[in-house]
């Protein structure tokens, strides 16, 4: 559940058809605070790193880069190929946030939804959007 004061931010999240290159995110004149490609494949990661924009995901990512806006890529691959690791490392030096869809297990999730919430919570943290999808680390010792 989201906290009420942040619902207005979430309402601004828009999903687009990846084949629609006429969509607003394909243009630098569209003012977005951040771009998220979630999930993203190794192929898409490679295309973005190489500057190839053949669909809306790659085009909007390159728009984010040229306009110096926040770009978050959520790779879904496992394991990563060396080519993908090199592309992600390269883009990380450009300021791209690489946030693998890899949930933690230290919070002892009981459901698939809790695993999903963990990843979504990390994305929301990068966007400075308050949430209560996961517990914050308290620094307290826990029994094993």
Model-predicted segments: where are they?
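A cross-family phosphate/adenosyl-ligand binding-site feature
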Residues: 1-72, 78-144
């Amino acid at each position: 559940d989201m906290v009420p004061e942040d619902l207005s931010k979430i309402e601004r999240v828009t999903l687009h058809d990846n084949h629609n290159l006429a969509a607003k995110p394909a243009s630098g004149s569209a003012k977005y605070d951040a771009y998220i490609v979630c999930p993203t494949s190794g192929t898409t990661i490679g295309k973005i790193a190489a500057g190839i924009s053949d669909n809306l995901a790659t085009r909007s990512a390159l728009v984010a880069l040229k306009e110096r806006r926040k770009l978050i890529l959520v790779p879904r691959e496992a394991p990563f190929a060396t080519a993908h690791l090199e592309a992600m490392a390269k883009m990380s030096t450009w300021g791209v946030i690489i946030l693998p869809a890899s949930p933690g297990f230290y919070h002892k999730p009981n459901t698939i939804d809790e695993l999903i919430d963990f990843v979504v919570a990390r994305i929301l943290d990068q966007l400075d959007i308050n949430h209560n999808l996961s517990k914050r680390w308290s620094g307290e010792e826990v029994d094993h």
